[in-house]
Each structure stands twice: as C-alpha cells, then as structure tokens.
Swiss-Prot record:
Official protein name in the record: Probable endonuclease 4
InterPro entries reported in the protein's UniProt record: AP_endonuc_2 (IPR001719), AP_endonuc_F2_Zn_BS (IPR018246), Xyl_isomerase-like_sf (IPR036237), Xyl_isomerase-like_TIM-brl (IPR013022)
Protein residues bound to Zn(2+) 3: H181, D228, H230
GO molecular function: deoxyribonuclease IV (phage-T4-induced) activity; DNA binding; DNA-(apurinic or apyrimidinic site) endonuclease activity; phosphoric diester hydrolase activity; zinc ion binding
Binding residue positions for Zn(2+) 1: H67, H107, E144
Length: 286
C-alpha cells in the first residue's frame, strides 16, 4: 500500500508537525522547512533537530518531504533574483540535510519571457552548481510537475526530460507527480486507457523509476486549463476513478502519496480525503 500523507503546518517549530500528522493518521508527511513566504529564516537549532528526530521516531511517520519556498525561481532571467533564489534553495537543501529529510520538492520555476529552453538551461545550471558542491548531502531534489500557469516550466514531461539531460547528478534528482497539475496541463488520467497512456508517456520521456513521490489532488478546473486549483479527492474534474487506478498501481505501491487539498484548522478535510484514498486500495493476498 502507498504511504499516504498530507502537508502539515510547522507552526511552533518543525518538530510540532509530527503531532499534527499523528492526529490525522499520516503514514508520510510534507512540510516547509521554514516560513515559505520569507527569503531567510533563523538556523534550525540543535535542540529542534533533536526534537524532530525524536518525534519522527515516536510517531513512525516517514518519509518526511520538504517543499521549498514559493519565492524561489531558479529560471529567473534577472540575475539578482536568480542568485537570491539559488542562495535560498541551497539553504532549503541544507535544512533538509540537517533534519535527515530524503526529498526536497521544487517547482522548476518560471521563465518570465525568455523562453522555455532558456529557462530550463538556467534551472539546470543552478541545480548543477549546487549539486557539484555537494550542497544538501544526500537529499534528493524532486522536480514537480506543474499546471503550466503563466510562464511556469515543468508542465510538459519533455521539460523534465530536458532537465535530466542537462543535470548530470541523477543520483540526487527525481520527480514528484502532482495529479491536479498534470491534468490541468493536459494529461488525462480519468479512465484506464488515458491513465495508461499518460504514464507510458512519462515512462518513455523520463522513466517511472525516477518518480519518488505523488501529490494527490483533484482539480477544480478542467483538462488542459493550465490553471492550478486543487479540489478534494473525487470532488473535482478528475474524479475518483483516476485515484483508484493510481493507489492500486503496483509500480507505485510503496511511494509516498501526499494530499494538498483545501482544509481548515481542525484538518477534518484531511481525514476525509485520506479515508477515501485508503478505501480505494484493493487489499490483495501477499
């Protein structure tokens, strides 16, 4: 069975996320390693690192995945913004290493007018520079599929394939597939035929072995809308059948599958979405 999880708040410190995750029954978890809307943050203290490890051991929640700051744009044509983004991304990687977090999810960025190829080259150069320096230890960078809003990169599987061509450090590079994003980008997964075709295309261009994580989100907007609006599982334009296919796909049977669906402070919606996903899993004899 996949390891189902959700994105949890780090209010009060990164270690506090585990109690929240435990309260909604998470197997896996995604967090921000710092305030996602600020460029800088104070270092993680030794005490907080120890508390994080202790809470992870206590709860058994794993893996923990970090999503980087929304401010970071490694494709930015403006050198000052790009350099600021590279410094911030390096800090994200180092925080992951300090917390022994295996995966850092990032959107490939937005080219803001210089063109997709030029943007991809800038992203690849930035990531290659950091990985060449060994920043982040063994933490793997997961390139997330995007919906393709504006000039965002990563909405075509070809973009991911190009980044793997340009970045030589494949042991530190993987993929996170967001169901809402690929659907909004034009990849249909609503029935067995379209599901198989979409993942065959991803396998051909990138390789399914490079997929390390899923974001499970339904979509408020229709196929090919290029608009990123998450919906509760089964309540959007994708529908339940796609998620039934995904959670029972043996190729992804042990991967973390993280929901990023709308929720309030009591996280009741997380419990609802996770219960639905688990109910879709067919139990087979070992």
């Amino acid at each position: 069975m996949p390891r189902f999880g959700a994105h949890m708040s780090i209010s009060g410190g990164v270690s506090k996320s585990f109690a929240r995750g435990e309260s909604v029954g998470l197997d896996a978890m995604q967090i921000f390693a710092k305030n996602e809307r600020q460029w800088t943050a104070k270092p993680i203290s030794a005490e907080e690192m120890a508390a994080f490890q202790a809470e992870q051991q206590r709860t058994g929640i794993h893996p923990v995945i970090v999503h980087d700051s929304y401010l970071i744009n490694l494709a930015a044509p403006a050198d000052d913004l790009r350099e600021k983004s590279i410094v911030a991304f390096a800090d994200e990687l180092e925080r992951c290493a300090q917390l022994k977090i295996p995966y850092l999810v990032t959107h490939p960025g937005a080219h803001t007018g210089i063109g997709e190829e030029a943007g991809l080259v800038r992203v690849a150069d930035a990531i290659s520079r950091l990985l060449a320096e060994g920043v982040g230890g063994t933490t793997m960078i997961l390139l997330e599929t995007t919906a393709g809003q504006g000039t965002a990169l990563g909405y075509r599987f070809e973009h991911l394939a190009r980044l793997f061509e340009l970045i030589p450090y494949h042991d530190r590079l993987g993929v996170c597939v967001d169901t809402c994003h690929i659907f909004a980008a034009g990849y249909d997964i609503r029935d067995p035929d379209t599901y198989d075709a979409t993942f065959a295309e991803l396998d051909r261009l990138v390789g399914l072995e490079r997929v390390k994580c899923f974001h499970l989100n339904d979509s408020q907007k229709d196929l090919g809308s290029r608009v990123d609006r998450h919906a509760h599982i089964g309540q959007g334009c994708i529908g339940t059948e796609a998620f039934r296919l995904l959670v029972n796909d043996p190729r992804f049977a042990h991967l973390p599958m993280i929901i990023e669906t709308p929720k309030g402070e009591d996280m009741a919606e997380d419990r609802m979405n996770l219960a639905l996903l688990r109910s879709l899993v067919r139990i087979t004899a070992a």
